[in-house]
């Protein structure tokens, strides 16, 4: 991908390209996503598009990077050290805060769907690795404070927590797709947090 050519595009056209690609990658797997649909949606000529974008892989990486920046402006997870003083009270606050922000954040919603549809992409893998590293650091603070089980191996505990949180995401995604207007996010979060606490608590 030509970063220089992308940077030289008018801001409105850059935004239209990223928005069209984000919608495409969020609604389909990487294999099913169509560059032709993206080109038509953002109303670029094929010659202009391919002057900037050299592959579907580079476009997805670009989209993930932009959505991460936009999502960070809406919500950023706290530093792991913030969990040290009162692990479970902080965990409840973070869970509630994420639940409050997520339904209103277009970037978070799109990024969430892209991650689930394109786990093998390098940009998505990098994001997943950063998330798993954060989870491990958070749990280490919980272990050190005695808030969570210290008998379980730390790596197994982190894997179990990350897997359960991924299951929560998958379940919530199905709920919102099936009944987007009636999904009870508050009740769902209560059920999820209770299960997570049962898994981890000392």
What feature does the model see in each segment?
Residues 1-12, 174:
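N-terminal intrinsically disordered/low-complexity leader segments
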Residues 16, 24-58, 62:
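Helix-turn-helix
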Residues 20-24, 41, 62, 97, ...:
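Short amphipathic alpha-helical elements of helix-turn-helix/winged-helix folds
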Residues 62, 76-104, 154, 158-161, ...:
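Hydrophobic alpha-helical connector segments
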Residues 64-71:
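Short, basic, alpha-helical segments at the C-terminal edge of helix-turn-helix-like DNA-binding modules
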Residues 92, 96, 132, 136-140, ...:
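An amphipathic alpha-helix signature
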Residues 96-136, 155-158:
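Short secondary-structure transition hinges
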Residues 110-113, 143-192:
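Hydrophobic/aromatic-rich alpha-helical bundle segments in the mid-to-C-terminal region
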């Amino acid at each position: 991908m030509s970063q220089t050519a992308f940077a030289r595009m008018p801001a409105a056209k850059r935004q239209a390209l990223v928005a069209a690609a984000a919608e495409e990658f969020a609604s389909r797997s990487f294999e099913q996503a169509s560059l032709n649909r993206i080109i038509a949606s953002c109303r670029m000529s094929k010659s202009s598009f391919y002057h900037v974008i050299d592959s579907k892989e580079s476009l997805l990486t670009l989209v993930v990077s932009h959505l991460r920046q936009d999502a960070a402006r809406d919500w950023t997870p706290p530093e792991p050290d913030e969990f040290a003083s009162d692990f479970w009270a902080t965990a409840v606050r973070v869970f509630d805060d994420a639940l409050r922000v997520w339904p209103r954040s277009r970037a978070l919603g799109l990024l969430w769907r892209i991650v689930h549809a394109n786990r093998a992409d390098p940009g998505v893998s990098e994001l997943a690795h950063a998330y798993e590293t954060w989870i491990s650091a958070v749990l280490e603070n919980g272990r050190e404070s005695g808030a969570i089980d210290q008998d379980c191996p730390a790596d197994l505990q982190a894997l179990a927590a990350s897997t359960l949180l991924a299951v929560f995401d998958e379940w919530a995604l199905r709920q919102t797709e099936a009944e987007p207007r009636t999904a009870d996010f508050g009740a769902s979060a209560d059920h999820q947090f209770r299960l997570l606490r049962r898994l981890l608590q000392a």
